[in-house]
Amino acid sequence: MNLGTINGMRACHISVDKQDEYIFTAGYHDGKATVVKINGDGSVGKMTSEVMHKGMGSIAERNFRPHITCARLTPDQKFMVACDVGIDQVKIYKFDRNYGRITLVDILRCELNSAPRSMLFSPDGKYAYLICQLMNCVNVYKYSCVNDEPVFEQIQQISTLGKSYNDKSAAAALRFSSDSTKLFVSNAGDNSVAFFERDVETGLLTKRSVLPISGDYPKQICVFPDDQHIASMNHESGTITFFKIDYEKGLLVMNGAPIKVETPNVAVIAKIES
């Protein structure tokens, strides 16, 4: 329909609010988070807010300056979280819907060189799941809003790797099953997918298995609408591989031949209603 500017370098992640009124973008190269209005006809409107992350991580590692990799609203639509792998922080911004503005109100300070990459929330809005790229783990938080302030209480940290693994591994993506009782995490470098069961009452994860994905550098994974299959976007090998999930045995069984695609990054699988 049209193009809109974010007044910076290209974004690596975008999301929208539940009302489809605003777009939230994350800038890896410039460490910038941006809010853009969505017009009534669905076209991209004007930029309403922008923030630049500042600071340094460990200068001994490659992630030593701001790199935002995820920007999305909390389920109550009151705050925007911005995951920054460069400075090992998740910055939390209050979101003013009337004006589309974001204001920093809190920071989750993660472990040094953990590289918090992406955060998802449970459908009931009670729990947040944060993957840390360089630590190859998932941090689980209880989330609530108390006196109009965000509260994140960490209740678990669990590895995404198996007993034997590639020491160059980096946790890349996480996805829920449609009923949110299962969580899948891809490990780039290790070239595997970790499969967790999720207790919907406590929010805690139990690791069932970590299995190879028959490709190189799985940057993203997709869960099919039937919750019985997943697809892995293997960036370096230029393939998409497909698997049938055996939940009882905790296994992934390759399903069909890989599809050749040049450096796949992300895909969305949707069920078409007849």
Positions of predicted regions on the chain:
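Short coil/turn segments that connect the beta-strands within blades of beta-propeller domains
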Residues: 19-21, 76-78, 124-126, 179-181, ...
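Asp-box/WD-like beta-propeller blade repeats and closely related beta-sheet repeat scaffolds
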Residues: 2-70
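Beta-rich catalytic cores
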Residues: 10, 67, 115, 170, ...
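Conserved beta-strand positions in repeat-built beta-propeller and related beta-rich domains
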Residues: 25-28, 74, 82-85, 122, ...
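Short loop/turn segments immediately following beta-strands, especially the blade-tip
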Residues: 35-46, 93-101, 141-152, 196-203, ...
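Surface-exposed loop and turn segments in beta-propeller and other repeat-based domains
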Residues: 3-5, 48-63, 155-166, 259-273
